[in-house]
Design a protein with these regions (language model features):
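Active-site helix of classical SDR
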Residues: 121, 157, 165
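Short, small/polar-rich loop/turn modules that mediate ligand/substrate recognition or access, typified
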Residues: 173, 178, 246-248
Length: 262
């Protein structure tokens, strides 16, 4: 299937590893020009090399900077003013008991997970509306629906993304611009691998995975962590012109963890 993404310019925030890297790779494979973003020159150059090794003809650009910072977001928009596709992927997570989460952590999570996407959307949405085409995708989480007791501050940010995504879609009614949220479930990313190492006590990953889905996420229908590529496959489609009738949606790629049909 041709997703008609050739020469579309896509920005994926936080795209040097994990789900972001998989999304950037998927978009590049479909012919999009992709801006790779990370906080350091080394992380960006490593990601660029990795994608080029897999896709030699990929058209890639790099931007080093923390897009949770307002001034850096402005710099991004000045350097790349004509983005067609914006994937708000930048985010952090950290399990912590509610009683131990200080105000500073609440603000930090909101700044990175929520305001980064708000700012980039505010910068790029007017241009998309002007040319009557564009795609904005927020990478939320099933944790925005099923708030995890072990990281309530993270769940709060993911719920906020759902509200922002739907609200922005309402402002695009009657245009060729769509705004959607994609909700991954437990996904085996770099961050999750590190999280597993801390919790597993030296157990093999397969053993930990089996126990995790038995005791922590028993509602999962696939009984395993999704791959970053499985998440990216949905995101890349939502970014394409073929997804023109999908707007204002919260699309789950959660392995059936959320026990509802909608």
């Amino acid at each position: 299937m041709d997703l008609q993404l050739t020469n579309k310019l896509a920005l994926v925030s936080g795209s040097t590893k994990g789900i972001g890297l998989a999304i950037a790779t998927g978009l590049a494979r479909e012919g999009a020009k992709v801006i790779i973003n990370g906080r350091t020159e080394k992380s960006v150059s490593t990601a660029l090399a990795k994608i080029r090794q897999e896709i030699p003809k990929a058209i890639l650009l790099g931007f080093e900077g923390d897009l949770s910072d307002a001034a850096t977001a402005e710099k991004m928009a000045a350097q790349f003013p004509d983005v067609d596709i914006l994937v708000n992927n930048l985010g952090i997570f950290e399990p912590k008991p509610f009683e131990e989460i200080p105000d500073a952590d609440w603000r930090r999570f909101f700044e990175i997970n929520v305001l980064s996407g708000v700012r980039l959307s505010r910068l790029y949405l007017p241009g998309m509306k002007k040319k009557n085409w564009g795609r904005i995708v927020f990478i939320s989480s099933e944790s925005g629906i099923q708030i995890p007791a072990e990281m309530i501050h993270y769940g709060m940010t993911k719920t906020a993304q759902l509200a922002i995504s739907r609200g922005l879609a309402e402002t695009c009614a009657g245009t060729g611009v769509t705004v959607n949220a994609v909700l991954p479930g437990p996904t085996r990313s770099d961050g999750v691998d590190e999280f597993v190492k801390q919790l597993s006590g030296g157990k093999p990953f397969a053993e930990f995975e089996k126990e995790f889905f038995k005791s922590v996420r028993p509602s999962s229908l696939i009984k395993r962590f999704a791959t970053t590529e499985e998440v990216a496959n949905l995101v890349v489609y939502v970014c394409s012109p073929l997804s023109s009738a999908t707007n204002g949606a919260a699309l789950r790629v959660d392995g059936g963890v959320v026990k509802t049909c909608f």
